[in-house]
């Protein structure tokens, strides 16, 4: 019948794999070369905001900032223990860095020979605390754009230890560096731990090595083929290898156990045993892998398009993992069969027949236990807190975290926002709006062009180079500081 014919064709395919194992290994090794090159040249996107829907207010505001002001991200730079002249020199160094659009300090508004004390009080408080002064640095790239992060790195190099660069751009720069530095380390740790567990639970010390090699090759193929997407996010890059290892390991274990069973059916004919093992694996694994792939592809329907990025890459990884499991792994096992046999050992894990028999006989106990445990599980699921602050779990000694803490301590400024208002608003209305904002609980300051220059100075006499920083033909830029932490419920309210 049709089912028997189809199974026969799958067995033939398995036997063909077993027969041509050397060719398959050679081709799979050669494919690592372009995959490795593509993996190294695939652009990694660290701009997490680029995955947000384009029609939300935040993204619209960022687009206006770029189009009308030539600005994207910004950072607060706190300077300690410098004279005014030294601050001016530092400011000039920062202004000379690529992707720095503007640097605003109090000398942008007034000459440094003018005592700071004669400045408007709110302007003085914004730029100064007891022991330090503050500069605002605007970048011509997005908050987490490549250009912005490169500028952050160079700013750290030229400013020295007396300058503390805070803000989301600095945090994302540190996250990028941390991810690049540690991703290889935790992949190695995962491989070592999984290999140790497999070496103990399997009946050969060597077979875990071939599991890891075949899965590792599939991971490289997966990361290499990402080149066809143009770029992937740094989160996808960091998660892919470990996720793919965990998701596809079961396929390899199933193939190995099926091969052992078929060796008993066909003693002395390893190729035939492997052919049937491949057939059994395809029949069993395809169904489970399809549900896994569907689960990852479901992420593609998220409005936050990072889900598309991660979902497609992981679905592709599962497909490549299945292909590797029924082609590369069998070729490894048959080619190195003698070495595997020499490293065989008695199974360390005892037989679970008594336990499985008890579970079957007393199934009602386990059903009852799971129903009872479901109640606290549902309660916990609906009552735990979710955090959205990216820097809350980062090491406290990172440059950006230290800078953010100092900014909070010295200036009572835990987060900063940009507000775009119509440039045609009258100064009186703008100042009234800013005063209303400052009266909102948690707002530490609200500054626009009018508050920077003061009500006594006509806007017409302000140099265009100064005015263009905060005002365009259509919009004016207002900075709002908050004493609440970024992404907290309080600041969102």
Predicted features by range, described:
Residues 54-75, 79-172, 392-493:
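Structured non-transmembrane domains adjacent to transmembrane bundles in polytopic membrane proteins
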Residues 49-55, 214, 238, 391-396:
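Juxtamembrane extracytosolic/periplasmic "stalk" immediately C-terminal to the first targeting helix
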Residues 49, 78, 298, 343, ...:
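Conserved short-loop catalytic and cofactor-binding motifs
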Residues 1-44, 143-388:
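Membrane-embedded transmembrane helical bundles of large multi-pass transporters/channels
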